[in-house]
Design a protein with these regions (language model features):
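Nucleotide 5′-phosphate-binding alpha/beta core
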Residues: 1-111, 118-142, 148-150, 155-157, ...
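Residue-level signal for inorganic ion chemistry
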Residues: 39, 112, 160, 213, ...
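AMP-binding/adenylate-forming
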Residues: 127-130, 136, 159-221
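Short, structured coil segments at secondary-structure junctions
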Residues: 185, 239, 261-265
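Adenylate-forming
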Residues: 193-200, 210-253, 267-273
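Short hydrophobic/charged patches on amphipathic alpha-helices used for structural packing
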Residues: 199-202, 206, 232, 381-384
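AMP-binding/adenylate-forming catalytic core of the ANL superfamily
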Residues: 213, 317, 322-432
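Conserved AMP-binding/adenylate-forming
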Residues: 245-343
Length: 480
């Protein structure tokens, strides 16, 4: 009970409309200085990197940046608990039965999906894990700020349906697997897999009667189509209050359509495994708000120079202000983000993210029994989760059933292609796609950059070729 009451008190403190821009900046500065001091004292990696800097006065731009490759290469020296070892964590995450079990009896463990290249291992303590839920409920839902409504969750818990890929150590699933036990009375969670039959998921959702649904844009749009076509009847149950999109961009058009279908507000969250509370979805409109008292988001150009609000950056630098176990400072992420130039109309003092373009991918598809079926990116991505010697990858559709998986090993490492092939085909078989796809594996030293100067990790060259052929076959002047 004490843990739940402490959590409710945290919700009150995090309520954004009690804050001002000045108090947010002051709290950010306080936590930033504390993080630097802790990292320099307890992390051999940061002790070297921050040597010679006055950590009480240096500016953010004085600090070195951190890439995923650098973090993974120096992992044992970067973490602040010397008992944490990269090799042990890798073995720990390879055993799915460890999901939800605290590493060293203290830490939650996850690995990033690898959608941004090489997977990264993440450890965080139980306070950080609880903060994920506190921030999202205090800032990304229309819960009232009064104490009693929060206390009422002990009697009438929030009902959350979460649609992810298969169970695993990727961040969204791990967050719920490591949810502190004292939160159990406040949150009833229905976990759904995007790979399960849609009719099964529909029945589970309707029986559960969720207040909130969270999922990838592609999964939410699939649910919307089921509701629109009458195969799901969630709206008439009058239970759904909010839909939250995570991990994939959701267009305004799609968001508005989902709102009209379900009669519930649709919000976006922009986050990553390295900083799960980076933003919270706006409770009134589109986009999300940076939790600037808990994280720093720098939108920069290719030379790490800040770009003004309203201008799309080439990448972002993320500083996590709450994870002292694995300090993540000015961490490079290959996302093209645009911050709002004007304050958000909702009145929040937190900075508003207007647009995220870096994770847009081509759609992959096959024809199955005469019906076109989308093949989600995760079908290829999940088997690559634990390939820690993988630096980069690209999935390319080259024909109606032909796919190429291009793999770049970390410099000085070799990839076990036969092992990767077995993992990939096992996943394809479990998805019921084995007789519908042909997969070729290519190991290469580099993947050509796209027009934006970034790696395009999912390409559908087949549909691009078909579109070009169609255009070429249209007579000149047709349609004018």
């Amino acid at each position: 009970m004490f843990g739940a009451l402490r959590f409710i008190a945290t919700l009150q403190k995090l309520y954004p409309f009690w804050l001002t821009t000045e108090t947010v900046k002051a709290k950010q500065e306080e936590r930033f200085r504390a993080l630097l001091a802790h990292a320099a004292q307890n992390s051999p990696y940061y002790r070297r990197k921050l040597a010679g800097l006055d950590l009480a006065t240096c500016s953010l731009s004085d600090l070195p940046t951190l890439t995923k490759a650098e973090m993974m290469e120096n992992y044992d020296d970067l973490v602040t608990d010397p008992r944490i070892k990269k090799a042990d964590l890798s073995a720990f995450t390879h055993n799915l039965s460890n999901l939800g079990r605290l590493y060293l009896g203290r830490y939650g463990v996850s690995h990033t999906s690898g959608s941004q290249g090489q997977p990264a291992l993440i450890v965080q303590d139980q306070d950080a894990l609880a903060l994920i839920f506190a921030v999202q409920f205090a800032r990304a839902t229309k819960l009232k700020r009064r104490f009693l409504p929060h206390l009422g969750r002990l009697i009438n818990p929030a009902r959350m349906a979460v649609m992810t890929v298969k169970p695993g150590f990727y961040p969204s699933a791990a967050a719920f697997a490591y949810r502190p036990k004292y939160l159990a009375p406040m949150f009833k969670v229905l976990r759904l897999s995007y790979s399960d039959p849609m009719e099964t998921n529909i029945r589970k959702i309707e029986n559960f009667r969720p207040d909130y649904i969270t999922g990838y844009a592609s999964a939410l749009e699939a649910l919307g189509r089921e509701e629109e076509n009458g195969r799901m009847k969630l709206r008439r149950l009058e239970c759904l209050k909010q839909i939250t999109n995570v991990a994939e961009p959701l267009s305004d058009t799609a968001g508005n359509w989902l709102e009209s279908i379900f009669g519930a507000h649709v919000t976006d969250e922009y986050a990553m495994g390295e900083c799960m509370v980076l933003t919270s979805g706006c409770i009134e409109g589109r986009g999300s708000h940076v939790n600037a008292d808990l994280a720093i988001l720098e939108v920069v150009d290719e030379n790490n120079r800040p770009v003004p609000p309203g201008t799309e950056g080439s990448k972002v630098l993320v500083t996590n202000l709450y994870n002292y176990v694995q300090p993540i400072i000015r961490y490079e992420v290959d996302d093209r983000v645009t911050m709002s130039a004007a304050p958000c109309s909702c009145g929040s003092p937190l900075p508003h993210v207007a647009k995220i373009a870096g994770r847009t991918k081509d759609l992959l598809w096959i024809e199955q029994d005469g019906v076109r079926r989308e093949v989600p990116y995760y079908v290829f991505l999940v088997p690559l989760h634990n390939v820690l010697d993988l630096a980069e990858h690209q999935i390319v559709q080259t024909g109606p059933r032909q796919f190429v998986v291009r793999l770049v090993p970390i410099k000085g490492k070799e990839l076990d292609i036969e092992h990767i092939r077995l993992l990939m085909m096992k996943n394809v078989r479990e998805e019921g796609l084995e007789s519908h796809v042909d997969i070729e594996f290519q190991v290469t030293s580099a993947i050509p950059l796209g027009p934006s100067g970034k790696v395009i990790r999912v390409k559908n060259e087949y549909i691009q070729k078909k579109a070009t052929q169609t255009e070429a076959s249209v007579p000149e002047g047709a349609g004018i």
